Amino acid sequence: MKNLSILLLSAFLFLLPLKFASAEKVHGIAMHGTPKYSNNFTHLDYVNPNAPKGGTVKFGSYGSFDNLNRVAFKGSKAAGLGYVNDTLMRRVWDEAFSLYGLIAEKVELPEDRSSITFYLNSNATFHDGSPITRDDVLFSLETFQTKGTPNQKKTYGKVIKTELLGNDGIKMIFENNEDKELPLIIAGFLPIIPKKFYEDLDVTKTFLDIPLGSGPYQVDSLDPGRQIKYKRVEDYWAKDLPVNKGLYNFDTIIYDYYKDSNVLVEAFKVGEYDFRREYNVKRWLSEYDFKAVQNGEVILTEMNNDRPVGMNGLVMNTRRCLLYTSPSPRDIPLSRMPSSA
């Protein structure tokens, strides 16, 4: 009887790690806790699922662009390219950090976050109608691991092994489970690019060819460095997914570029583009009482920023001491003044 008890205890201890290492297929994942939306949600709370579609919206951008290549580190990428390529999952904006199925219909994330497994949506297609396959996902991962930006190489390089599971699963195994955000970053930020379009290109170089994508918009036309125009994909494969309903309603999105920041502001004042975020407090307080504001054509809104923000300040690159608090510099003997070495 004693031997039987020992045998049963051994079997339990053997199966215990398997239990905690296993995971179930789910529709969404969260950085902390569980996602807000259940697996049968129909749309996000902050959208109108029946919003009308049509019209054009114009944005103003500062600078220029010379690149439509999502991979190349060189050059300046055009604004709006994120609309062209879908990711495996979609991040939502009424939760701190949660993602829901997009190209990946379901996902498995073990409790220890040592890996993540994506199960692709069989309806996912590129704009030419060709299916998005696991080969495209693997190609995207490997391309950004080896030829992306330094940050992308570092992040995606933490995937040390991949496995194909069944007909639609792809498992990514990490070098360790120390980075708890890594599974969510891969799910929500890795652009899935078509292998057939990129495999014969030198992806380290810039290009201005219209890229093949899978997202809600595709490039319609461009004037390099001056303007890029996107058109809504009417037969977008994911338009009816709960995570997308009520979004991407404009038929056309245009980004106009301005090489002078003051001209960019003045262009908004006379209606050359439709929306602007103002980060300059002085300008906000002194320059936003123009005619279009007075007659109600432009609506000003102040929004609280509840997120952590970076430091603003001046950093002096010098070896000289810039300021003495006590005693006064004029009271310090020359022999004690800092050298310029």
Language-model features, listed with the residues they occupy:
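Aromatic- and charge-enriched surface segment that lines or borders ligand/interaction sites
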Residues: 47, 52, 72-78, 106-150, ...
